[in-house]
């Protein structure tokens, strides 16, 4: 990650409206990963990441920041929900599986990068194997015959290679030897994923090296052989070592719904997956060693970003030790009508742009007018205020309702409207949503 904090924020601004404090916090945290790697080894070991706690109502961009961050980081990234885990000793997933999943994500990410790097070599090798299947070697009895045969074969091979690359042979059926994949599905109760993975790896390795002849079309065979050759060119041991280092030095874990495992005030009762999960998270965030398929992973330098709405509890309801391990607090603000207006227009692939593109596939044009977008934003804000505040997610509900009739009759409307677009203005929005927005009982159930 060589992007500066300003560049990271600029990239996040393309997709997320507002929430500048949260963007700055994650941008600085990401940049600090790069800064740390420039330090001498002795000092680098002492610099630990400053974990972040994002606090804000639902639908304001907490999870979206995490999603966009994952694409920007080019580092092992995992998003999990705190509610999926239980205290060690109970049925369910324990928190150490977070690091095991992160290790799997790192291995998958690096393998994909390595396969892209060796793709050209794999394609050449795959072409040769397909051509061998298409052009079997003829028997020769003398040296002169062999020389003539070689020259003829070379010309024929070049001709077939050209036709193969142009796709002229795609539908031709050939018989070719490919690796015999051993697919074993093992069902196991929650919390036993590690054992399941080990058993699957064991069965897969037992079948490694076995080959069988299969009749396939050239197009299918080429893809299968290309993947096989690419896997052969990848050094698995080297890949595992790189993945282990990537997890330990650059890994990022985003823990959503952290407020759901906070103890709500003085409420009593069984707290199997509340305080117990928090206490299990402590050593993980502070720094411990977890056994994974890559080996022992130290979590000391993994960045943890936790987020929660905290509408039924407060950050102070988390156990004090966990609060101390999330030193950077960022509050995300509730969305205003102006924010809704910007969300509908400004982000890359905005909601209005998506609906226009979807209906365009039927040959129907729709145009969102400025007054229509403003009215839609006002209704979204009003409904959120009167009922449950679900943030920007309310816009999905409203747009589906607004364009329901148009979507249903798109094919018929396209033939009658020709090139003239349907205008989505304030009057159109009021006629379709105005009554629902005003009637609180209706909006509670429909919007």
Swiss-Prot record:
Record's keyword terms, sorted: ATP-binding, Chaperone, Cytoplasm, Nucleotide-binding, Stress response
A biological-process GO annotation: protein unfolding
Disulfide bonds: none
Residues that coordinate or bind ATP: 17, 59-64, 256, 321, 393
Main localisation: cytoplasm
GO molecular function terms listed in the Swiss-Prot or TrEMBL record: ATP binding; ATP hydrolysis activity; peptidase activity; proteasome-activating activity
One of the record's GO cellular component terms: HslUV protease complex
Signal peptide segment: none
Superkingdom, taxonomy of origin: Bacteria
Compartment(s) where it occurs, according to its Swiss-Prot or TrEMBL record: Cytoplasm
Gene3D superfamilies documented for this protein: 1.10.8.60, DNA helicase RuvA subunit, C-terminal domain, P-loop containing nucleotide triphosphate hydrolases
PANTHER family from the UniProt entry: ATP-DEPENDENT CLP PROTEASE ATP-BINDING SUBUNIT CLPX-LIKE, MITOCHONDRIAL-RELATED, ATP-DEPENDENT PROTEASE ATPASE SUBUNIT HSLU
Family label: Belongs to the ClpX chaperone family. HslU subfamily.
Subunit structure: A double ring-shaped homohexamer of HslV is capped on each side by a ring-shaped HslU homohexamer. The assembly of the HslU/HslV complex is dependent on binding of ATP.
Function: ATPase subunit of a proteasome-like degradation complex; this subunit has chaperone activity. The binding of ATP and its subsequent hydrolysis by HslU are essential for unfolding of protein substrates subsequently hydrolyzed by HslV. HslU recognizes the N-terminal part of its protein substrates and unfolds these before they are guided to HslV for hydrolysis.
UniProt-recorded name of the protein: ATP-dependent protease ATPase subunit HslU
Organism (species): Pseudomonas putida (strain GB-1)
